[in-house]
Amino acid sequence: MTATEFKLSHLGLALHAYHWSATTPSNGKVIGIIHGLGEHGGRYVNVASYFSALGYEVFAFDHQGHGQSEGAKGTIQSWESFVSEISTFRAAIEGALDTPHKLILWGHSMGALVLLDYLSSRDEAETLTAAVVTSPPLKLGNPPPKILKSLASVVASIAPKLTKSNELKASDLSHDAQVVTSYQADPHNHDRVSMLLGYHMLDTANRLLAQPQSIPVPMLLMHGDADRICDISGSRQFANAVVGNVLLHEWPGLYHETHNEPTQFDVFAFAKTWLDALN
């Protein structure tokens, strides 16, 4: 399945974007995908293929410093510029469609964290139809030592563009060996994370868990209980405290990329059923 690719202009940066058109008559619904750390929106073609066959328009984009977007690998201008990419993305979707539609944002991993911050802090989030959040890094499977956490803000202020390996193991993404091999061979993936981005990811996760958050739209939160990258306990803690219509669905035995597991169609079907029930 081939996407129509285009560019978004965001605070002086050109962000790469994708549009997979519905392959059956439109159902009036749109999914906007927000990808994770080190990867890019083009990796979600399987999600797009499934939902476009159901009449959804599907869009995705590459974050700054990721994929085919501008910005040094793994770096951000600021956390505010990172979160506000969603507003730019939404405006591009609105500009591409000339008929009324219902917009669902789907965020995975780092993209899930950014989406949770957006949902809990932006008034414009209230105009969404729903959100799907998968495997957010609210708690890490291999958290940094406490001494590094305490120094993170200092290092980020002194050397915000300095990058290090994100230490992600491709074998922890999926049980599907082909997914792992494709991830490792993909020239648009990278393993870099800047001091500024890393600090803000840790800080945002702590902030979102420190007190109950209010989510203004229905939200489906999915997480594999065998995720070794982002510990499911963070999703459980968030869901137990959140104010709003939030459903946590745990997937027994699944790794980090629930949408890329051998049982991915079960994940898609569950999300479809949940979205259908919102009507």
Which positions does each model-derived feature cover?
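Catalytic nucleophile-loop/oxyanion-hole region of alpha/beta-hydrolase
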Residues: 38-40, 67-97, 101
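N-terminal cap/lid segment of alpha/beta-hydrolase-fold proteins
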Residues: 1-23
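Catalytic active-site module of serine/aspartate enzymes centered on a nucleophile-bearing elbow/loop
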Residues: 245-279
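Short alpha-helix in the alpha/beta-hydrolase fold that links the catalytic acid
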Residues: 217, 231-241
